[in-house]
Amino acid sequence: MTWGRSGRVAHSDWRRLASEEDRREYDAFGPWIYEIKAEGDTPKRFRAACASHHDARFLLKAPRNVERRDVRPGMDLYVAVLAVHDDGLSLMRLTDERVVSQDVVWSEVAALESYKDLLYSRWTLMLRDGGAFVFEYNTVSAGLMGKATDFVRSRWIRHDEAPSARQANSVVTVADRYFSNALAAQRRHGPQPVEPIHFEPAGRYCRDAANRFAISTGVMFLDAPDELIIVNRDKPTRRFFEAVDAVSCIFVPYAGLTSFALARPPTCRAPRFHQLRLSVDKQVVEQSCLVEPAGVLARLAAYGVPQTA
């Protein structure tokens, strides 16, 4: 009987027959994003598209979302390459056996969102025309993407004088372990100093958008000299026994804001949410707040952002 023998030979052949370059790429393959530092690091499918991007500040290749046991040397192991330059970025995707590129300059960007939910992460540039530029990756690469995030944020620093500082009685205390850690992370890694200007702890009884009883997940607004930072848990409420693992950080440069509005909720026994709308041309960033975010409204007014009804 030779069934097992023929299977073993076939299993070993795919590695022996692969080129050294394909074996090297296969051996390094995993769920993480790699920084491309030499032409040999560039996936074959992307080499023509990447030819003009080797001077990028960040040149990152994202793997396919596939089990390692299902891939072999020579397969297309990478689905996207992100090139971040001083004046903008390019996202190259492999679709239908060809590479499609999307280019963005910083003046087209309205806001940036960094989203994580366990092992799934998403990096989104919200564009002024209402569109979005999305790059998905595994959370194991959060450190590298955090560096890319800080670089993008540094592109909208204006280097002029910010509005006058907040009064001493406007200091906001963040009394929540999760949000305290998020604040510490922003202070440690961000390109500019930040201060909390509005904070709502998680765990408050409230009503959700459908007027059902729920528990709030909390929100924190941070003020930096050139940007407003919103830290939330993706959705404003959870069910009573629901676990929430997601976190979203949204970075909105003050200079790009064209208007803001606050929709107040009807009065009822259980609190309902205010809806803060930040507009950057056709792009809108919305955030639910159980309490009127007076500190945020004051900062927006100080920057001269017009309020609409």
Please place each PLM-identified region on the residue numbering.
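Short N-terminal edge-element motif at the start of the domain
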Residues: 61-69, 85-107
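Intrinsic disorder/low-complexity detector
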Residues: 1-79, 86, 117-226, 231-309
